Amino acid sequence: MINRKKKLSLMVALLSLACTGLEAQNVWKGTWATAVEKTGKEDMPKESLSNRSCRQIVHVSFGGNEMRLKLSNEFGKHPVEICSVYVADTDKDKNSSINAKTVKYLKFGGKKNVVLEPGKALYSDVLKYALKSGQRLSITIDYGEKTPKNATSHRGSRTTSYIVAQVNGKPVSPADAAFGQQENVDHWYNLSAIDVKTDAKTPVVAVLGNSITDGRGTTTNMHNRWTDFLADALNAEKPYGVLNLGIGGNCVVEGGISEPAMKRFDRDILGQTGVDKLVIFEGTNDIGCCGGNYEHVADTLVACYKVLIAKAKAKGIKVYGATITPTKGNGWYSYWHEAMRQQVNEWIRKSGSFDEIIDFDELVRDPQDPQRLKAEYSDDWLHLNPKGYEVMGKFAAEKLK
């Protein structure tokens, strides 16, 4: 009797361990995300998205066998009708084409069609899909008749989206050659995030930034933002989520383009799935747009950093501070602006507020003229070029491993 009880207890213990292991392999983590924005007429296709299909390409960080897609109408004032959404492997030779054998349609509450309500975002149902690390994934949205004039979007996709008209009231087939032949734009529409089922220990880093993070100066469709290089370097060793939440022209405190970081932080950073690390690399525009009262603006920027750091740490997120890179040679540079940058960078390095520092300033500045970027890393003395972004991404990877 005693032996039977011992055996039963052992079986229960083993079953419990097995279930725990299964749960650890079965949690959602973010593999891709973008910061959604309110768009203007200049950011939309020449014609509306109504009764058209839009194929959009994203570069995921790590893979898995189950995924879900988050769509957003958070800045829309009207519903968005969607007939269907499907994903597929992007053709390796032609960005607008897909491998038709890999097409899989997403469902929303068990249905292909869905309506995105104004001010809302929603996830698709779970989709079994063999997603690979570093993959270029095509996401095609077949829009219905009713779409707003200004879609919730991300302006700086740095990839081309391919838009085609429906035929006889029906979306064209996934393999239709019309993709790439009608209208092409370099924006994303209604896309927000992709999550993958993975091990609970898979790390995820979110990056809060401006145009340097958003990829100004990169090569369209080549996926050479510094966060792309970061994702590739990290995933060469193990699965690692890298989420780029940069917005071109964005500020931390106020002003700039789109909602400032202080306003968008809860949605764009804390709202992502499974984030356990955060890089704050923003402040260039707060400094560059400053027209006076420089010391006060720098102090305010630091005070806002403290708020963001506290919010992240309250959620158990490790926070990395990235120093602001040089601007000499660009129109934003002046003695006073440089003094602000030095003041803020000094605080980032020495305050002890961040868990760790990623010193991009020291990395990419010209040793002979430290207020200026190295010539080989920049084409406009403000943003980096692909060579500079590669150096940044690989450097950051060593800090984040």
What are these regions (language model features)?
Residues 2-3, 13, 24-208, 218-220, ...:
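N-terminal secretory targeting modules
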Residues 305-313:
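Surface-exposed amphipathic alpha-helices with a cationic face
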Residues 11-18:
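Bacterial N-terminal signal peptides
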Residues 202-227, 248-251:
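Catalytic nucleophile-elbow at a beta strand-turn-alpha helix junction centered on a G-D-S/GDSL motif
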Residues 262, 288, 325-401:
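Catalytic His-Asp segment of secreted/periplasmic serine-dependent ester chemistry enzymes
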